[in-house]
């Protein structure tokens, strides 16, 4: 019995269900349009989609070539994104989440929906990017 690809409409909810560290997730198209979200709050999902698209666009501007996996850390948590030519799957995770595990879960979810689990441009190897933002305590 073969199992078909995962419906993109449920991919973010599946990611949140399978990863204890992931708080919220969204799936967007290359233009930043919201495809689906784990959160029932549509305004929050649209905001997260816009921010994820901005993060991916900023990474593309900062480095030559497209990145297939991104990570940004703050004191309050982290945002991760994995993309291919069709979708970007992004999530917000708790602060102490292990990045390699979160990226693994993102890639597995992308594979389940029929994505390439990385490789922003078909036929080109992807690159992972990490930007860590340090915040200093005023004390």
Named regions from a protein language model:
Residues 1-24, 30-139:
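Acidic, low-complexity cytosolic segments
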């Amino acid at each position: 019995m073969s199992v078909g690809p995962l419906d993109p409409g449920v991919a973010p909810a599946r990611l949140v269900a399978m990863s204890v560290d992931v708080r919220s997730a969204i799936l967007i198209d290359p233009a930043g349009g919201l495809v689906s979200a784990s959160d029932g709050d549509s305004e929050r999902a649209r905001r997260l989609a816009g921010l994820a698209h901005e993060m991916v666009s900023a990474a593309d501007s900062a480095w030559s070539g497209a990145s297939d996996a991104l990570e940004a850390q703050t004191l309050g948590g982290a945002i991760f994104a994995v993309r291919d030519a069709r979708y970007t799957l992004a999530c917000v995770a708790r602060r102490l989440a292990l990045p390699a595990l979160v990226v693994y879960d993102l890639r597995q979810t992308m594979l389940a929906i029929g994505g390439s689990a990385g490789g922003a441009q078909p036929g080109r190897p992807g690159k992972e990017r990490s930007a860590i933002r340090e915040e200093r305590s005023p004390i």
